[in-house]
């Protein structure tokens, strides 16, 4: 039975897309009974000043965290302003973080394989291969391909290095794999979709009514929603004009929900301060997301860049419909007819699709009819992902 180390940078204290994807990948591998898996989670330590500057939530410094029977050994590094300046201002490699990698890579010694998620995880895996000869697989989820390598040349160079040294690189969408071709053509690449957790299911009528009451939605109101980081890459500043246009063009009462937090939250709240029927929920606990998705009629995702947005797949599994921008892997989840290309008419065209989807739901007011409007592609399945990932380890 092979011994596998899974290593990645994320937060078990604020579980969102990347963490949930890795967690479900680990669950899938363990569930086969065909391998032993240990999980290592890399996490930065901020003081009060750097936390305020970076808008990072407080995280308790603990040795390990257990979630659903999986123990994550925490590898802590202190966020360094010196390293930040070296990379972001001077285009140099960080010195303190490199020391952190060389100090803690010893934990990977003795494994048969390393599976790395995120650029930081891949750096550890690369170092383990150089020191101990351990083969590794690197999974790429989005910004570590389409954004960060293009900010700073040394990040692009190191991304190329770790991609080319991997046994195989897995990308969560065809679009992301295509984007990686701009980084290197000399690495093995495969698409390996993420799946959707079993907890994301369509509730019965009583369950939906309870969820709507929980989130303060009045009877008879339709629900439009955004869920994600309130950041520039998510293009959240177009939400106010989209919501306004939808409200003007859709004849029924509609309640808009914004779930998430981030640097642009205050600006969004200011721009929507005079609007009615708007709810800012902040960060929603992972356990509450299925209930929220069961309240949603149409989820909107106007991002400037994406890998494979699991929030779209989760919404579809709960009976919502989704309209998104034509970037990354969004169309691979929700269908090419349900995305809007960025351009001068983005807001009116996006709002038009949202209104059309709301009206179509009125004509298909049951789960089967709503699913017929949009179906989750069958390849977005944890069972298929696990089987395929395991086949590479055979």
What are these regions (language model features)?
Residues 175, 195:
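Carbohydrate-associated surface elements
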Residues 268-284:
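Nucleotide-activated donor-binding/catalytic signature segment of Leloir-type glycosyltransferases, i.e.
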Residues 321-324:
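Short hydrophobic beta-strand element within catalytic cores of glycosyltransferases
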Residues 116-121:
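Short His-centered aromatic/hydrophobic patch
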Residues 283-284, 291-296:
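Short alpha-helical donor nucleotide-sugar binding micro-motif in glycosyltransferases
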Residues 304:
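Aromatic "clamp/platform" in nucleotide-sugar-dependent glycosyltransferases that forms part
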Residues 5, 217-234, 240-244:
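Conserved donor-binding/catalytic core segment of Leloir-type glycosyltransferases
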């Amino acid at each position: 039975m092979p011994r596998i180390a899974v290593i990645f940078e994320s937060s078990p204290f604020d579980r969102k897309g990347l963490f949930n994807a890795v967690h479900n990948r680990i669950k899938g591998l363990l569930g086969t009974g065909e391998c032993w898996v240990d999980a290592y989670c890399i996490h930065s330590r901020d003081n009060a000043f750097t936390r305020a500057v970076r808008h990072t939530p407080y995280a308790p410094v603990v040795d390990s965290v257990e979630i659903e029977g999986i123990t994550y050994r925490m590898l802590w590094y202190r966020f360094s302003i010196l390293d930040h300046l070296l990379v972001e201002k001077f285009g140099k490699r960080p010195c303190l973080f490199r020391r952190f990698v060389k100090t803690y890579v010893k934990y990977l010694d003795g494994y048969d394989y390393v599976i790395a998620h995120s650029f930081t995880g891949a750096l550890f895996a690369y170092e383990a291969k150089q020191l101990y000869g351990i083969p590794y697989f690197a999974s790429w989820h989005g910004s570590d391909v389409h954004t960060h390598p293009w900010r700073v040349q040394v990040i692009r160079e190191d991304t190329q290095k770790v991609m080319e040294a991997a046994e195989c690189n897995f990308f969560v969408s065809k679009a992301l794999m295509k984007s990686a071709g701009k980084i290197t053509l000399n690495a093995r690449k495969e698409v390996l979709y993420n799946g959707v957790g079993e907890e994301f299911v369509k509730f019965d009528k009583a369950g939906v009514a309870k969820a709507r009451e929980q989130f303060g939605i009045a009877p008879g109101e339709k629900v439009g929603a955004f869920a994600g980081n309130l950041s520039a890459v998510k293009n959240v500043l177009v939400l106010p004009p989209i919501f306004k246009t939808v409200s003007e063009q859709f004849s029924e009462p509609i309640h808009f929900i914004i779930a998430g937090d981030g640097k642009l939250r205050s600006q969004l709240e200011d721009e929507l301060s005079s609007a009615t029927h708007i709810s800012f929920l902040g960060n929603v606990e992972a356990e509450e997301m299925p209930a929220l998705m069961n309240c949603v009629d149409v989820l909107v995702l106007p991002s400037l860049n994406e890998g494979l947005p699991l929030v779209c797949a989760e919404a579809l599994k709960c009976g919502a419909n989704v309209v998104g921008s034509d970037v990354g892997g969004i169309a691979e989840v929700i269908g090419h007819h349900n995305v809007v290309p960025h351009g001068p008419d983005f807001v009116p065209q996006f709002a038009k699709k949202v209104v059309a989807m709301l009206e179509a739901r009125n004509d298909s007011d049951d789960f089967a009819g709503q699913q017929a409007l949009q179906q989750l592609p069958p390849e977005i399945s944890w069972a298929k992902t696990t089987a395929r990932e395991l086949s590479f380890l055979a």
